[in-house]
Amino acid sequence: MKNKLYKRVSLVMFLLLIVFTLGCRQTPQKEKSIRIAVASFSHETCTFCPKPTTIEDWEYYGPPTRDIIETDRGYIGGFKTMCEEYGGVNLQGILSPRGARGGSSGSWITEEAFEKYTNGIVKDLEELGPFDGVFLSLHGAMAVTGIPKPEAELVRRVRNVVGDIPIVVTLDLHANEDHELSDAADAVFITKRYPHYDTYLQGERAARVMIQTIRGDYKPIMATRKPGVITPSVFQGTGVSPAMEIMERARRWECQHPGVYVSVAFGFAYADVPDVGATVMVVTNNDQELADRIADDISDYIWRMREVFAGKKLPKTEEGVALAIAAAEAGQTPVVIADHSDRTGGSTYVLEELIRQGANNFCIATLRDEKAIDEIQEKAKVGDKMTIDVGGWTDKYAGNPVQIEGQVEFLGEYQRRGTTIVLLFGENNRVILTPQLTQVTTPDFFDPLGIDVKKLDIVVLKSRVHFRRGFHETGLAGVIFEVDAPGWGPADLTALPYKNIPKDIYPVYKKD
């Protein structure tokens, strides 16, 4: 009996000891919340255009804002989504400038503007820190008077403030960058598609590597290469050769090596800067040898494809318009003419040639002409008929003003572009006037203006590749002609008056 009682007491004491021990164990600590700063400063600068990009242009749509995390649907939107999926991440918006008026029709950014917005970002980082990481949504083709490599300079200044924490950068496919940027940042991710469908995806990738790096699960190592090639934007579409094959090669490396990120920027040829041209940037998890091997492979491949880029030819204005009219007469409507070389938006070469060759049922979408808009607003209302000169004055390659005798079909504010006017003239012809360069990418642009684009014979767009999103890949366009009219965005890069680019870059200087 005593033995049984003893055993029971011993068992109870043993169980109590277990309960006591478990109760005394320290409650597991929750993983520390991660705090990441998010900023944006983005511009694609066509340095050959006549008008500098000033503070006034940057603040046309409003002053700098910290609300970028809630309003962005591209890189920052993807970054935010991935952070939410990981959990335990707090994002802090940093005072960032909005998009500049005129976009890439603006020339050199003034040093005053660059310093104002860079200093604003740096000051916010100082005052709102400390942070565990910094995410910068940049473009890569920014050009600033007096600052040769502005994005790299921005990242260096951020580094000086935040110290040795991860700085992750996203760039546009048209970026002009080199090792100075990758030396200052920890990881760089570049859009792989043109049209740029994957900005959201690149933001997600940036967040994944950022969080893994902060938690010690990833150690980003980079390799950067410059193949020494510049290419016209009109030939950089990733749905056609050779850009398609180059991007497929990059994706193949990523498939073979999980955790490796291979980025290619084809560059922006219309910025006269020292780091112009294609760039390859590879991020690996602590594997420099692999990063170097992949970067060398992609860079060498781009160099081997250089003549495919340079060998492409486009019809000049007269031939291109004749081809478009013939296609329309054959029933391949709507015919799309891509007036790709017009970088200021006010060129009249295609409009003038359409009229000269007797084209009907066409629409110019759009023609930049603030002067004509002001005159029409003063003298006319919707339904009024008038005669007015349009276009042909924005730059030396804008052509001649074209006299239009027509009717005001639409007059009003439209999609934050300012006052927009549609002039109807001739046999169902239209020209859409806007106060700034407008790149129409989808057919729904025409709907609020009362234009049924499907019923047009010919539609002229001031675009290079982005229009393919809504007119080619949807099957809307019967046929497309890219017309090489005079302008600051030509297919023949040897025609541009470069001063600052490398003296061995292909095809401008290096011929073999």
PLM regions: where:
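Bacterial Sec-dependent signal peptides at the C-terminal "C-region" and cleavage site
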Residues: L17-K32
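Extended hydrophobic packing segments that form well-structured cores
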Residues: G93, N119, W303-R306, R416-D512
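Bacterial N-terminal signal peptides that target proteins for export
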Residues: K2-V12
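Hard-cation-handling environments
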Residues: I34-I36, T231-N428, I432-T434
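N-terminal amphipathic/basic leader segments beginning at the initiator methionine
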Residues: K30-Y86
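Active-site histidine-anchored catalytic micro-motif
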Residues: A37, S42-E44, F48-P50, W58, ...
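Glycine-rich phosphate/diphosphate-binding loops that line cofactor/substrate pockets in enzymes
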Residues: Q29-K32, E85-Y86, K123-D132, G320-V335
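Cap/lid and interdomain-hinge subdomains that line or gate substrate/regulatory clefts
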Residues: Y86-L95, M142, V161, V168, ...
